[in-house]
Swiss-Prot record:
The keyword Cell membrane applies. It comes from Mannheimia succiniciproducens (strain KCTC 0769BP / MBEL55E). The keyword Transmembrane helix applies. It is a multi-pass membrane protein. This is UPF0299 membrane protein MS1271. GO terms for cellular component: plasma membrane. Keywords: Cell inner membrane, Cell membrane, Membrane, Transmembrane, Transmembrane helix. The chain crosses the membrane at residues 5-25, 28-48, 57-77, 92-112. PANTHER family: HOLIN-LIKE PROTEIN CIDA-RELATED, UPF0299 MEMBRANE PROTEIN YOHJ.
Length: 144
């Protein structure tokens, strides 16, 4: 029991420390990117370079992910509270969201097409096509 408490406290301290460092960077560099995003980038870089061990943050992160839906309840209540404001500004909210979604889909589509056209991705492309063909055969067999 003490071991689990230690793991939980250690992982939360590390996660919050990274969050506060990200908030500090966001205050030092006022470019409109939230501190939590800087914190996520620091965490990502730390995990990929293995400066931060996965075991150090796994217990707290998995607990937070498990209860993520509960953590979004206040946000949902806030959206419902200001629904009249959202409806009155619907066009100024929806148009940028739709445009940015379409641009993102196009960029990802072209990037994927480019990456799959490279010679180094030939093996990956063959593997993906083989998996797709197997899924198509299985789906046709289930439909009959």
């Amino acid at each position: 029991m003490r071991q689990k408490i230690f793991l939980f406290v250690r992982s939360l301290i590390i996660l919050y420390l990274i969050l506060f460092i990200g908030e500090g960077i966001a205050k030092l560099i006022p470019i409109g990117i939230p501190g939590s995003i800087f914190g996520l980038l620091i965490l990502f870089i730390g995990l990929t370079t293995q400066i931060i061990k996965v075991d150090w943050v796994f217990f707290g992160a998995s607990l937070l992910i498990r209860y993520m839906a509960v953590l979004f309840v206040p946000v949902s209540v806030g959206v419902m509270k200001y629904s009249d404001l959202l409806v009155s500004h619907a066009s100024s909210l929806l148009i940028p969201n739709i445009v940015s979604t379409c641009v993102t889909l196009l960029v990802i589509g072209f990037l994927g097409d480019y990456l799959f056209s490279l010679n180094s991705f030939t093996r990956l492309r063959k593997k993906a096509i083989k998996k797709r063909d197997i899924n198509n055969v299985n789906n046709k067999g289930e439909a009959s």
